[in-house]
Amino acid sequence: MNIRSNPDTTRPAVTTGGLPSSRKIYAVPATAPDLRVPLREIMLSEGAGEPNLPVYDTSGPYTDPGVTIDVNKGLSRARTEWVKQRGGVEQYEGRDIKPEDNGNVGAAHAAKSFTAHHQPLRGVGDAPITQYEFARKGIITKEMIYVAERENLGRKQQLERAEAALADGESFGAAVPAFITPEFVRDEIARGRAIIPANINHGELEPMIIGRNFLTKINANIGNSAVTSSVEEEVDKMVWAIRWGADTVMDLSTGRNIHTTREWILRNSPVPIGTVPIYQALEKCDGDPVKLTWELYKDTLIEQAEQGVDYFTIHAGVRLQYIHLTADRVTGIVSRGGSIMAKWCLAHHQESFLYTHFDEICDLMRKYDVSFSLGDGLRPGSIADANDRAQFAELETLGELTKIAWAKGCQVMIEGPGHVPLHKIKINMDKQLKECGEAPFYTLGPLTTDIAPGYDHITSGIGAAMIGWFGCAMLCYVTPKEHLGLPDRNDVKTGVITYKIAAHAADLGKGHPAAQLRDDALSRARFDFRWQDQFNLGLDPDTAKAFHDETLPKEAHKVAHFCSMCGPKFCSMKITQDVRDYAAGLGDNEKAALNLAGAGSFGSVGMTMSGVIEDGMAQMSEKFRDMGEKLYLDAEKVKESNKALS
């Protein structure tokens, strides 16, 4: 059911209601009975003969019929109490919103401000604030308990096949356990191998974890530009993206009303929100990178941290000494953030202020538990530039910065390319693990060829599946509009579904113990011709049903034992089922003919094995003719015929 609810006609309309034959359920962790961890239960048809299937759910309360959605008020801020109960924080007035925060937009173009105002929190003193600091001190937070329950997909105990699934996969050194415990989560965060991006000011958040020993996650990018989109569209795209499976969303807005757009998104987002602060900082100085200053950038970090942004992409690895390494590239510097900082460095002939002030950035981000997403500003923008010295020089610097951020108590993940051909992908993963101490890797694709504008969701989905299998923790989606324009909601859905496929394929390859449950359930539904179950178990039930109904639209076709590709006579699965039914109704002599093993004579009837087989085949040939030479027969008629033969 897709209901476009709009409590205020001047505010965003968002999609609510569950996916077909699904319902929102909540798991309750044994160690924290006050927590309710969301899952989506896919309800199978009565004839399925198997239980309903719980799956990971990112859609938040938008698919819970028991929750009234009002985007003007935002979502419940239940997590704020968790933060306050831990202590070590203070509530304060926060900075004033300035005209430049929204690009000095005039009254005629100003978006309506979000209704509610929440005073921000910040850490004080030496008490642990970040999930990394709690983990290092051996403290299991509610967020850690929450994500452990979430990662197990509703399983209360180890699957019977868990060890076999792990053994069957190739994890390339990952250590995926058969069952996720809160202690395992804490240990992975303490080692720096996983993060829970969770700003203390994002009270609406449903915590999730990013790390190669957990389910592979995906990110969806949204955001306005100077020429298109609005607050309404971006809030709608955020809700639409998480409906289809986006684990995090990045707001990459570069036009008017940046602060206001972000506030509406955050107050209505149950998933982590990331940004690239340099984009907004650039808008504050009229789009001229030369005018950027550390003070302006720092103020932007504080502004966004107070709002609740969960992770910042910071291109601190773009150093003055690396810029010349891009001179011989085919496509130069393709990262917006990277090119901004490169121009600043060259204009001032100084080291990047992001690099020289990195310690101070860490101190600021720690106060709010904003996670680092250390940006790859020198990523390759073409196959020809993949794995060059510029790319890897920056990666080595990101490894150095990771250690500094950890020492300051911050959570860190590393961004990666880009455009990389298949044979060069694993080198990227191996080098990132080595240089960055196994901090989670977060890549854009990578795109595996440059020849398919309009289809780069496919060129990148191929690379994403591979690098996810090799150990990449989160995959940033690419839409069909990549390199061509700003994606609309249809492009967002296509990008999300494409990357859910890639992430799931990676989990299957790694041998994640619960990954294959959904595949097997759908395969059984396919073999049993349970069409509705096939649709509903898929990542996109609406499209699957629409494709089926283009040629077989009647309700009777939803129970037919064929589809339009092969028709009723040539469906391999229907033929296989008929063979099974036929075998079940064979008489003893017929079974002997078809199942004899070994050579020699069949003493009880005085015939050789070949004679028995020939006789059996002759009987079946005659029987086929007697029953009208029909390929498909009623099972009861076959059984009656068999009784006459036996």
UniProtKB/Swiss-Prot annotation:
Its cofactor is [4Fe-4S] cluster. Zn(2+) binds at residues 419, 483. Its EC number is 4.1.99.17. GO terms for molecular function: 4 iron, 4 sulfur cluster binding; carbon-carbon lyase activity; zinc ion binding. Residues 1-21 are annotated as: Disordered. One of its GO terms (biological process) is thiamine diphosphate biosynthetic process. [4Fe-4S] cluster binds at residues 563, 566, 571. GO terms for cellular component: cytosol. Pfam families: ThiC-associated, ThiC_Rad_SAM. Homodimer. NCBIfam families: PRK09284.1, PRK13352.1, thiC. This is Phosphomethylpyrimidine synthase. It comes from Rhodopseudomonas palustris (strain HaA2). The gene is thiC.
